[in-house]
């Protein structure tokens, strides 16, 4: 008799859980989408960012008028854009954090696909020029801090066999980093002599012999980036 009661209780609990699951399944899926760019307040162009991930730029949205106390956060891409297709329609405040000073938070009504750009000032802007000669690539740079009081601590010239490139381990294959305090500089990579090129030559060949270069500059404890430049190597 006791065993029968236990079985009945278990069956009842299972039925309750199944009913609750059915109720959850009846909720409509999110129909909203927010997308946009973190735009340089002066140039109007997207701010180049670190690789998308935990060490990159974060966009946070908070629903307004619902009593929500927890923001929903997601990562911006290294080209300065972002997109989140898993939100409900409604009113939101939008903020972002990264190697820039955000020019106030935004407020947007999400209705279907909704654009919401953010205005920001990076700590520095980086101009990069690349000249190629067969298997060699010469990268030159100019770093311009956005405030006269900002000092450039260190500058990096990076290359990678994937487009996702920044100063974090695993996000670059080779680098030239002895530009301490420099606002200008250049370096020539002879890729066929680079150890990581030799170690990853098959991957590079599968990707059309492409490698990617980028400049990073540390200023006020934050690292800003140039855009990523693609090189197609000619080893003939």
Which residues does each PLM region occupy?
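Bacterial Sec-dependent N-terminal signal peptides
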Residues: 2-8, 14-45, 235-236
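Short, ordered, surface-exposed loop/turn motifs in non-cytosolic proteins
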Residues: 43-67, 150-155
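Short, acidic Ser/Thr/Gly-rich low-complexity loop/linker segments typical of extracellular
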Residues: 63-79
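Short Pro-Gly-centered beta-turn/loop motif in secreted/extracellular proteins
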Residues: 74-78, 83-93
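Extracellular fibronectin type III
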Residues: 222-235
